[in-house]
């Protein structure tokens, strides 16, 4: 006899597990299916983000930055650190332990909220039935009033650089290096490529980033992207724009990459090569032919603004649907869908999803860029404030970057906040909160910010929009 549930969630990543917990909190009988096998040979909850994405990469970024600080920056503070070394296996083991603790935490939350967990592969059948193929190969069918598909995404592989043991790797493999490569190649100058490239560059690798596009960080504000390129290049990342990889050859524990750029065909040899050219939705063996769920032309599950698919009672969230492939976007979609299933009128504002690149300095933004607004014909006022003028940043010896606030010239409503600098991810969230409630630049300028803090840079940038900044000369006074 099949088991019946109010909600069955396929996938326990940041979208799926959050949706399952919220649905259970709302009194719905909920099940969640996960098949990912972790490093210990057991099913691990948390999806790509927790196991091989957001969390482990941040652990390595933090470890590598501490090493860099000890070697290069302590002396400014009067601290003498001699003979600083890095134990890469220990660094990677620390990362693995963090992942283990967090995946176990999700399992505990499932139990606390009454979510029934199934280990295996979930497949949507007709009439909202879900087939679960367990790790032992046995199958069972769950009956659901509602199904939430949260199957996530996987790294894109490219024919010119097929994965090869531990020489050519994707983002997952790049988290497991046991030694610092002397020469590291990275294909793709997006979020993943820049973050992973930064990790190994700080530890001493000679890093070359090959980006097919001629423009660096095209989704970011042009002023911020220009500053980021300058800073990351100074840190040692050799970022080659307009470099299209055409072939690769693994030989004698190295890989030779062939690419074309403005100077014609080029070749570079690396000890390791990371392929970080994006991700694609996971839909393999996910939908039975008679499930009724349709895919769009790019292979994503088609959904409306409330994540409804073409089948009533079937929803899809996260990386498997349109929009930014971000964990926080998936989680909030999960909450929205669970609440709508429970009869609430939940909404999600897709215009205010923050984006972050966790290099150092961090790069973060929310809302629209200046170039987008100008292309749309919107007249704007812009205020900027450099961290070089921030007392708190000076005290921390971390003065690279700036905060940029963009406001509508007619209404003064804030339309975008863009940051490159220390704690950019935290600062941009303050802007997002204000923008969610329709804040104006004047509103932000009238708020009292603690002193001395990095957040004062946001305050000053907001004041600068209308020519009222205190701690820099205003470009124009109003």
Swiss-Prot record:
Keywords: Cytoplasm, Disulfide bond, FAD, Flavoprotein, NAD, Oxidoreductase, Redox-active center. It is found in: Cytoplasm. The keyword Signal does not apply. One of its GO terms (molecular function) is flavin adenine dinucleotide binding. FAD binds at residues 34-49, 58, 122, 319, 327. The active site is at 451 (proton acceptor). Disulfide bonds join 49-54. The keyword S-adenosyl-L-methionine does not apply. Its EC number is 1.8.1.4. It catalyses: N(6)-[(R)-dihydrolipoyl]-L-lysyl-[protein] + NAD(+) = N(6)-[(R)-lipoyl]-L-lysyl-[protein] + NADH + H(+). One of its GO terms (cellular component) is cytoplasm. It is an enzyme of class 1 (oxidoreductase). Binds 1 FAD per subunit. Its cofactor is FAD. Gene3D superfamilies: 3.30.390.30, FAD/NAD(P)-binding domain. NAD(+) binds at residues 188-192, 211, 245, 276-279. GO terms for biological process: 2-oxoglutarate metabolic process. The branched-chain alpha-keto dehydrogenase complex catalyzes the overall conversion of alpha-keto acids to acyl-CoA and CO(2). It contains multiple copies of 3 enzymatic components: branched-chain alpha-keto acid decarboxylase (E1), lipoamide acyltransferase (E2) and lipoamide dehydrogenase (E3). The active site is a redox-active disulfide bond. Belongs to the class-I pyridine nucleotide-disulfide oxidoreductase family. Homodimer. This is Dihydrolipoyl dehydrogenase. It comes from Pseudomonas fluorescens.
């Amino acid at each position: 006899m099949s088991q019946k549930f109010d909600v069955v969630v396929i996938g326990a990543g940041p979208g799926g597990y959050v949706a399952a917990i919220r649905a259970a909190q709302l009194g719905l009988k909920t099940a969640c299916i996960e098949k990912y096998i972790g490093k210990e040979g057991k099913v691990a909850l948390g999806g790509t983000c927790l196991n091989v994405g957001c969390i482990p990469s941040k652990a390595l970024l933090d470890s590598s930055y501490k090493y860099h600080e000890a070697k290069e920056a302590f002396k400014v503070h009067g601290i003498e650190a001699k003979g600083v070394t890095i134990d890469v296996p220990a660094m990677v083991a620390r990362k693995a332990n963090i992942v283990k603790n967090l995946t176990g935490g999700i399992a505990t939350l499932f139990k606390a909220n009454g979510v029934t967990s199934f280990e295996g592969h979930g497949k949507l059948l007709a009439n909202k039935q879900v087939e679960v193929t367990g790790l032992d190969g046995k199958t069972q069918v769950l009956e659901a009033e509602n199904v939430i598909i949260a199957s996530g995404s996987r790294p894109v592989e490219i024919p010119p650089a097929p994965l090869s043991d531990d020489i050519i790797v994707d983002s997952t493999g790049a988290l497991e290096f046991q030694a610092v490569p002397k020469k590291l190649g990275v294909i793709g100058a997006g979020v993943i490529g820049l973050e992973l490239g930064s990790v190994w560059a700080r530890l001493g690798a000679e890093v070359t980033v090959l980006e097919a596009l001629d423009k660096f960080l095209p989704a970011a504000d042009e002023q911020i992207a220009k500053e980021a390129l300058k800073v990351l290049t100074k840190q040692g990342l050799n970022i080659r724009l307009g470099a299209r990889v055409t072939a690769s050859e693994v030989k004698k524990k190295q890989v030779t990459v062939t690419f074309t750029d403005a100077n014609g065909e080029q070749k570079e040899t690396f000890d390791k090569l990371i392929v970080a050219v994006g991700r694609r939705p996971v839909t393999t063996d996910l939908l039975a032919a008679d499930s009724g769920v349709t895919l769009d032309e790019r292979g994503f599950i088609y959904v409306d603004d409330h994540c409804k698919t073409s089948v009533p009672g079937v929803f899809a969230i996260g990386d498997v649907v349109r929009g930014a492939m971000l964990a926080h976007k998936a989680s909030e979609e999960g909450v929205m869908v669970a609440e709508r299933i429970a009869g609430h009128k939940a909404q999600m504002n897709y215009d205010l999803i923050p984006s972050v690149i966790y290099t150092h300095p961090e790069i973060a933004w929310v809302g629209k860029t200046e170039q987008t607004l100008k292309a749309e014909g919107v007249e704007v006022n812009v205020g900027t404030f450099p961290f070089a003028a921030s007392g708190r940043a000076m005290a921390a010896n971390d003065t690279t970057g700036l905060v940029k606030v963009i406001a509508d010239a007619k209404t003064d409503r804030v339309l975008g906040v863009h940051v490159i600098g220390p704690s950019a991810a935290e600062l941009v969230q303050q802007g997002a909160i204000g923008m969610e409630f329709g804040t104006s630049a004047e509103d932000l300028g009238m708020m009292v910010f603690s002193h001395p803090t990095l957040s004062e840079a946001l305050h000053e940038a907001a004041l600068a929009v209308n020519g009222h900044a205190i701690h820099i000369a205003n470009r124009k006074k109003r």
